[in-house]
């Protein structure tokens, strides 16, 4: 566990140090979002997510019940396919690699065709730092020339898919025959009722929708205001 956590921390801190150039690179390559907000997302995906999961035990016996005579032992799943979108390319790459490293899985990053360079650069930074900390060389890899055909073949050959993207991509992941975790287009509804602080609600929704120009799929897409509140 100690070796795994050391590798994760080195990778997380290395990519966090490059959060600014990665944010600029993502913005310039995709034409999406706001640089300063992408910096925040990169920092969150690296430092905050690592700090959240750093104490989790992912090696050996993780749970034991002497009364029942049972033990739960953590083991790697195998090879993970990480499908990365053009909207949040670097931050998505960062947290998916951290998940793979923490759980001792190999990962293949498949960039969106419009975000190849920034996605690969984020993965390269993390791979180099992880290798220096003791990770075998080919645990982190990527698709240099992505295509639908390559993604389709890859999703059928790996052990787990973590797909983030459009509806068609997520549907393809779920239909591949491989276990998949998918995050597709958001349809988040904000309901404002009598208990709401109206000023706070409005400010929160505006901030959410304008952060990185609304690139995050969890931003509000629809607002429902009860008749008792609407004026």
State what each model feature region is.
Residues 1-70:
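N-terminal Rossmann-like NAD(P)+-binding subdomain of aldehyde/semialdehyde dehydrogenases
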Residues 59-72, 140-158:
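A structured beta-alpha segment of the ubiquitous adenosine-cofactor-binding alpha/beta core
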Residues 5-13, 20, 24, 147-160, ...:
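Aldehyde/semialdehyde dehydrogenase
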Residues 70-77, 100-101, 132-136, 152-156, ...:
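Solvent-exposed alpha-helices and their adjacent loops that cap or buttress functional pockets
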Residues 54-129, 133, 176-178, 187, ...:
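Conserved small-residue-rich beta-alpha loop and adjacent elements
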Residues 94, 102, 170-231:
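ALDH superfamily catalytic-core signature
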């Amino acid at each position: 566990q100690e070796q795994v956590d050391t590798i994760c921390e080195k990778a997380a801190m290395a990519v966090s140090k490059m959060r600014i150039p990665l944010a600029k690179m993502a913005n310039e390559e995709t034409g999406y979002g706001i640089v300063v907000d992408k910096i925040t997302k990169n920092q969150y995906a690296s430092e905050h997510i690592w700090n959240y999961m750093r104490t989790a035990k992912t090696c050996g016996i993780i749970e034991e019940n002497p009364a029942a005579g049972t033990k739960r032992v953590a083991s790697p799943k195998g090879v993970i396919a990480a499908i990365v979108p053009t909207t949040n390319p670097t931050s998505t790459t960062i947290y998916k690699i951290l998940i793979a490293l923490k759980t001792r899985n190999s990962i293949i990053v498949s960039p969106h065709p419009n975000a190849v360079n920034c996605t690969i650069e984020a993965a390269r930074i993390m791979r180099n730092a992880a290798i220096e900390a003791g990770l075998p060389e080919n645990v982190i890899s990527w698709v240099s020339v992505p295509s639908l055909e390559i993604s389709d073949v890859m999703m059928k050959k790996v052990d787990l898919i973590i797909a983030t993207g459009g509806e068609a991509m997520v549907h393809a992941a779920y239909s591949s025959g491989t276990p998949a975790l998918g995050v597709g287009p958001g349809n988040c509804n904000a309901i404002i009722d009598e208990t709401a602080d109206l000023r706070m609600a409005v400010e929160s929704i505006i901030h959410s929708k304008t952060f990185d120009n609304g690139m995050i799929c969890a931003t509000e897409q629809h607002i429902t205001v009860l008749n008792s509140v609407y004026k």
